[in-house]
Amino acid sequence: MRPYERWHTLWQFFIALDEEWADEWPTEAAAMDDLVRGYATESLETAVREWHEAFDKATDSEVEQIVADFNPSYEPEETFGGARQWAEWVREHLEAELQRRKTG
């Protein structure tokens, strides 16, 4: 099973939270608000859980393979400094949105 099939909910966020957000939104906060508000809290929780399954114990090579499978057309080195940095950026935004929802 390919990574995008194994961690399907997380994959959806890698498609949405890419390096091109700045082309469509004036700020990162505006992009995140627009991109994640349509997702149910349960989807965010699933994506965070899948993130940890995918990346917590992954080597740099494995992270690169997972990220490349999630979104092969993007080059995370240009915007994020590498695949692991993009993965961390996605996780940080998922967790921040969950926290925002929990605190109201």
Q: Model segments located where?
A:
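Short terminal alpha-helical segments
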Residues: 1-35, 91, 95-97, 101
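Short runs of predominantly hydrophobic/aromatic residues within well-ordered alpha helices
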Residues: 3-10, 28, 44-48, 63, ...
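Charge-rich, solvent-exposed alpha-helical interaction surfaces
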Residues: 13, 31-35, 47-50, 54, ...
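Generic detector of bulky aromatic hydrophobic side chains
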Residues: 16-22, 50, 76, 86
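Amphipathic alpha-helical interaction modules
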Residues: 20-63
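Amphipathic alpha-helical binding modules
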Residues: 65-104
